[in-house]
Amino acid sequence: MKLSYLSLALAIILVLAIVYSPHMEVKALADAEPDAIGFADAFGEADAEPKRRRRLRKIIRKVIKGTGKVAGEAAASAVAGAAVSAAIDAAVGTTEEPEQ
């Protein structure tokens, strides 16, 4: 139940951020001087190596995906092992403490 409320709250925050972001952008663009300074800074400090950053970002994503997959499989096998041993213990009738 808590998960659904959390999802609803995040969805509302996302919708509000999307709805109000153009309004804030228009409000910021109304003043000409900060725009000129902002655009000058943006073009003056352009990224010299965008390909390198993209490549690094791809590598980081692959590492995160691989790590998540391995962790998920390990957790699933641990839960399955615990469930099987609990079912066997229930069927046999033993009440021994599980090893940790």
Curated annotation (Swiss-Prot):
Pfam families: Pilosulin. GO terms for cellular component: extracellular region. Not detected in the venom. It is found in: Secreted; Target cell membrane. Glycans are attached at S85, T94, T95. It comes from Myrmecia gulosa. Keywords: Glycoprotein, Membrane, Neurotoxin, Secreted, Signal, Target cell membrane, Target membrane, Toxin. Residues 18-50 form a propeptide. Expressed by the venom gland. InterPro entries: Pilosulin. Belongs to the formicidae venom precursor-01 superfamily. Residues 1-17 form the signal peptide. Glycosylation is critical to maintaining the aqueous solubility of this protein, but does not directly contribute to its activity. Neurotoxin that triggers pain behavior and inflammation in mammals, and is paralytic and lethal to insects. Causes a time-dependent increase in cell leak current. May act by targeting membranes. Disulfide bonds: none annotated. The keyword Zinc-finger does not apply. This is U-myrmeciitoxin(01)-Mg7c.
